């Protein structure tokens, strides 16, 4: 079959029109080794630090070590199928996680994938896990209280919105219980909560989810879980992922609370990754940048001003400040708060709540040591009524602790010393509080008023808790208007003091306990 010249030229024209001369740039490397969740890749010359690397089987890696001839990356997921000689590709993207209101009430892993069996998370919004913290110009001083509902914390170690308050103590001493109670107490306040579980047993996380659901707190809470069975890489990035989810609310003029439980295990995971990447070890075998690991995370918790929120939302939200409050948890070994990671985090945060094993075993729960616990900025944010009535509590406890040791050796004590010991014993008893029994501002103020004005002094120590329960029950039924007024305003004046006096004296007269 012969083709005419016109047909030949027509075919050539068709071929020319279909010809695609676009160039596809693809940075490709070869995996030279894979072991313990670390891949070494040769040939990725234009990769950036912290960039996502596409590995075989729809798995990604995170570039951490950039050497002259190779890249060390940590695998975010299973790596059993990856072998030497496989290809790896640059993506030009950094790691992002889903954010937004749709995550509330859900349990997700460190990459934001749902693990609660409730289907996909209905959000298209994502945010990088690593972000620069807001600068000094965009910040606002902490002056709004974040109520935990725990008497000993709100009266002596107050927490403000935008603060970083460390919870530190040995294992099995009630650190998580304080954090969970604080999350439950935010119900109805508009504060969104993020609980980041790092290196915990899956059964423990399931138990916390159940507790939050029982108390109606899951509706305003996101749980980010990197369990003990997850890789060190996921335990390392989980706090940053949770922080990005919290920043979504902060940057839109809302208040959020994030709990990191616990950063000791994150430091262990990072130490493991660093040693596998052959980075030089330092004190306690941690890498040199373990301080920066926690400082860049905790500096993102802040209270931002109206201008920041307006600029971030392109003018959609005006006249509102946003905050992200952080409660990092650190586990100590045998009460050693002078170890490397505890001292690092103490120096980064705005105060610490120190829990003691001896106090816990003696029945004082929460086992807070008021001498070592401090809040550096929360005093300015404390509710006025709690600030006024709580000052006497700290003083009474300090005097009691000082005299307690002395009184063991002295046989006869003068009346004033005996009165201080008497008051201290009853205040110590009053500060005991069961888990899941958080108090409103008004009920807490009522308890503190009774202690501060000597209404507990003539009670037996065993009668203090029953008296408090009767006092609260009476106030909520007979004096509900006073309780509502205090909860709404939080102010303290002569009128409020008179009303509190009437309630306490009414309860003392009835002796209903």
UniProtKB/Swiss-Prot annotation:
Its main location: membrane. It is found in: Cell inner membrane. InterPro entries: ATP_synth_asu-like_sf, ATP_synth_asu_C, ATP_synth_asu_C_sf, ATP_synth_F1_a_nt-bd_dom, ATP_synth_F1_asu, ATPase_a/bsu_AS, ATPase_F1/V1/A1_a/bsu_N, ATPase_F1/V1/A1_a/bsu_N_sf. ATP binds at residues 169-176. It holds the Pfam family ATP-synt_ab_C. CDD domains: ATP-synt_F1_alpha_C, ATP-synt_F1_alpha_N, F1-ATPase_alpha_CD. The record marks 373 as: Required for activity. GO terms for cellular component: plasma membrane; proton-transporting ATP synthase complex. Keywords: ATP synthesis, ATP-binding, Cell inner membrane, Cell membrane, CF(1), Hydrogen ion transport, Ion transport, Membrane, Nucleotide-binding, Translocase, Transport. The keyword Acyltransferase does not apply. It is a peripheral membrane protein. Its EC number is 7.1.2.2. The keyword Nucleotide-binding applies. Coiled coil: none annotated. It is an enzyme of class 7 (translocase). It catalyses: ATP + H2O + 4 H(+)(in) = ADP + phosphate + 5 H(+)(out). GO terms for molecular function: ADP binding; ATP binding; proton-transporting ATP synthase activity, rotational mechanism. Produces ATP from ADP in the presence of a proton gradient across the membrane. The alpha chain is a regulatory subunit. Belongs to the ATPase alpha/beta chains family. HAMAP family: ATP_synth_alpha_bact (MF_01346). F-type ATPases have 2 components, CF(1) - the catalytic core - and CF(0) - the membrane proton channel. CF(1) has five subunits: alpha(3), beta(3), gamma(1), delta(1), epsilon(1). CF(0) has three main subunits: a(1), b(2) and c(9-12). The alpha and beta chains form an alternating ring which encloses part of the gamma chain. CF(1) is attached to CF(0) by a central stalk formed by the gamma and epsilon chains, while a peripheral stalk is formed by the delta and b chains. This is ATP synthase subunit alpha. The gene is atpA.
């Amino acid at each position: 079959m012969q083709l005419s010249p016109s047909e030949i030229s027509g075919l050539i024209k068709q071929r020319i029109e279909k010809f695609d001369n676009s160039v596809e740039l693809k940075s490709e490397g070869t995996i030279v080794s894979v072991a313990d969740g670390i891949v070494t890749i040769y040939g990725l010359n234009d990769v950036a630090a912290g960039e996502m690397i596409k590995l075989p089987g729809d798995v990604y890696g995170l570039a951490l070590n950039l050497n002259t001839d190779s890249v060390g990356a940590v695998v975010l997921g299973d790596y059993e199928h990856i072998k030497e000689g496989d290809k790896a590709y640059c993506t030009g993207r950094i790691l992002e996680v889903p954010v937004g209101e749709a995550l509330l009430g859900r349990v997700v892993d460190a990459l934001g994938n749902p693990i609660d069996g409730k289907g996909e998370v209905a959000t298209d919004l994502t945010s990088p896990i690593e972000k620069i913290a807001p600068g000094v110009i965009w910040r606002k001083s902490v002056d709004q209280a974040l109520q935990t509902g725990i008497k000993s914390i709100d009266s002596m170690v107050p927490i403000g919105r935008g603060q970083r308050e460390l919870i530190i103590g040995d294992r099995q001493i009630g650190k998580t219980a304080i954090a969970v109670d604080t999350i439950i107490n935010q119900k109805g306040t508009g504060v969104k909560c993020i609980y980041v579980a790092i290196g915990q047993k899956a059964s423990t996380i399931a138990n916390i989810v159940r507790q939050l659901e029982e108390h109606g707190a899951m509706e305003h809470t996101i749980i980010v879980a990197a369990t003990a069975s997850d890789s060190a890489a996921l335990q390392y990035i989980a706090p940053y992922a949770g922080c990005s989810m919290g920043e979504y609310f902060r940057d839109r003029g809302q208040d959020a609370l994030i709990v990191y439980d616990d950063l000791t295990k994150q430091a262990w995971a990072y130490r493991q990754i660093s040693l596998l990447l052959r980075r030089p070890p330092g004190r306690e075998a941690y890498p040199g940048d373990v301080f920066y690991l926690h400082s860049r995370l905790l500096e993102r918790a802040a209270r931002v001003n109206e201008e920041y929120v307006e600029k971030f939302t392109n003018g959609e939200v005006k006249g509102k400040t946003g905050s992200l409050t952080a409660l990092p948890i650190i586990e100590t070994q045998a009460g050693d708060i002078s170890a490397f990671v505890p001292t690092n985090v103490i120096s980064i945060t705005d105060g610490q709540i120190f829990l003691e094993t001896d106090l816990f075993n003696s029945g004082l729960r929460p086992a807070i040591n008021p001498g070592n616990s401090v809040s550096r900025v929360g005093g300015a944010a404390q509710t006025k009524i709690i600030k006024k009535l709580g000052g006497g509590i700290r003083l009474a406890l300090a005097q009691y602790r000082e005299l307690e040791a002395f009184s063991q050796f002295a046989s006869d004590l003068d009346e004033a010393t005996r009165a201080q010991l008497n008051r201290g014993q009853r205040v110590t008893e009053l500060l005991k509080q069961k888990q899941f029994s958080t108090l409103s501002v008004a009920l807490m103020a009522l308890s503190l008023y009774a202690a501060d004005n000597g209404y507990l002094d003539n009670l037996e120590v065993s009668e203090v808790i029953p008296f408090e329960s009767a006092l609260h029950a009476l106030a909520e039924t007979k004096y509900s208007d006073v309780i509502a007024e205090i909860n709404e305003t939080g102010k303290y004046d002569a009128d409020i003091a008179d009303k509190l006096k009437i309630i306490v004296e009414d309860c003392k007269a009835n002796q209903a306990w």
